[in-house]
């Protein structure tokens, strides 16, 4: 009796199974990247702002210049005081930040810049509120420390 050739070739090889598993893993990874992060937009913006506040304070101290933060229609930007006027720049690598359409930055200050960092490191207190319509997060800059509080914090 001769063995049936068709039965020897039935099923899938290990290589074929591994390729299918790799494709499934890639698709699952791509789908996971498309899901929302779960962190409210106001919280993400507050985290970014708190880091930028600390970097701006450090840039003012190391450069010996006053560094200003100006609230723009889209977010916020930094500038440097040249002794007479505020000049738009990227002091210490601080770039303008666009918060997106869903987040508003509120600060109780008038004029431009809304807040500035003293090169001596002695800075006043400031409170920034970020609101995305559902969550409201406050970033407080007090004595060189940054504190985040509010919904989603």
Regions found by a protein language model. Give the residues of each.
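Glycine-centered recognition micro-motifs in short, flexible terminal segments and loops
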Residues: 1-21
